[in-house]
């Protein structure tokens, strides 16, 4: 979470990092001290669903807890251990975090939402549901240089691990479980596995220079003034 402040008459960004794990915050503080960036950082050990700041923020980044199915290139066991129930449980938690965090964003502020999940239920559908329920928010298309081949038609960023894509031309006919190289990647293990793969291939979302990357999803929303 970030808000604008003033220091010696100069506008500066003030970052508040909230995490339920004190251990992860210790690692963050250690890194920030090494980089000499602690002066503008406040850390808070709290549950994201109960944290209530005294001031609102201009930017909020939600690195949401998720099924982590996008990391299966490095952790192939995930596709054998994760279930549809795991995805549904994370989807419910993500929705609650989004709704709570939205209360603390200033008008015109930006809300960024990110997961390392391949499931649309934790990405595209999660955001579409949110903006339907919260019409004071709108999608702010991500147009950063270098992301041209990673953008969806809605303005989100969606990246898939390279091995998730077939070696054949990216057509719906070739985007099968067999060609994706994961026969166990089924709707039983991950809802929308087939359709996610098809949608991503159709939109041309895997850039050649992203080889070796995990799968992830990013959306940017803006609160209307």
Regions flagged by a language model, labelled:
Residues 1-225:
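S-adenosylmethionine
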